[in-house]
Regions:
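Extracytoplasmic cell-surface/polysaccharide-interacting catalytic and binding patches
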Residues: 1-51, 131, 142-149, 154-158
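Extended, low-complexity, intrinsically disordered C-terminal regulatory tails
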Residues: 38-71
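Structured segments of extracytoplasmic/periplasmic soluble domains
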Residues: 45-53, 107-114, 185, 219
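Cellulosome-associated attachment modules in secreted, modular CAZymes
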Residues: 161-224
Length: 224
């Protein structure tokens, strides 16, 4: 974690990464902008994994006074530059549309983001760089959703529209998130993206059969 301080007037156009500049994290009532480099990093990873057309930061850094004006404590992760509320956009059949929060939260889980993830509502998601994992639903009094966004969102009636290929280590191992994604594909709940086809053999329709799913599960638990 490295929190850097910028001036909106002087540094607003400074590029932080391929897809983000300083002023996107700005607070309305101050020239000061604080940004955690780890936050920028995970936003870039999310952008790539979801193949976004853009990510809109609806709330980045907040001064303590601005945070309180929103009914918050004035001491949260936004006030230290460690949080961002976002909408993620992509193209579907030539039309730009927002990802549902289910897609974003599940993507962050698959990316291994064991910090703060909050489903605000609908398409809006909160991300922060706290040192401990806390995944929560703001619509349910900020209560923890547990350790699996896929299960939680399914119970809420939200199906992830496109799974994300998880990281595979140098030994070709995958984790339980990858295994679940492949199993979902094998029973027709989701389809694989081009990036995912390297995970297992797929047929011409992009489906994974039960043999592939079983192999991935065995890899996930270290039996293969």
């Amino acid at each position: 974690m490295s929190i850097k301080t910028y001036s909106k007037a002087k540094d607003g156009s400074v590029r932080l990464s391929e897809h983000f500049i300083v002023r996107e994290f700005a607070c309305p009532d101050t020239d000061v902008i604080k940004i955690d480099t780890d936050l920028v990093d995970v936003l870039e990873r999310l952008f790539d994994y979801l193949d976004c057309s853009k990510i809109i930061i609806t709330s980045g850094y907040r001064s303590p006074s601005y945070d309180r004006s929103l009914g918050c404590s004035g001491r949260g992760y936004h006030t230290t530059g460690q949080a961002a509320d976002v909408n993620c956009w992509h193209f579907v059949n030539g039309k730009e549309t927002r990802y549902h929060g289910a897609d974003i939260c599940c993507a962050l889980q698959t990316l291994g983001w064991h910090h703060g993830i909050g489903w605000i509502a609908g398409c809006a998601v909160h991300i922060d760089t706290r040192t401990t994992q806390y995944w929560f639903d703001e619509q349910n009094n900020m209560r923890s959703i547990g350790n699996d966004w896929y299960t939680y969102m399914a119970k809420k009636g939200h199906t992830v529209s496109r799974p994300i290929m998880g990281d595979v280590d140098a030994n070709g191992k995958v984790d339980s998130n990858d295994a679940r994604t492949v199993l979902q594909a094998s029973v027709g709940k989701v389809e694989l993206t081009e990036k995912q086809k390297a995970v297992a053999d797929v047929d011409e329709n992009g489906k994974v059969d039960s043999t592939d799913a079983r192999q991935i599960l065995q890899m996930a638990v270290g039996k293969n």
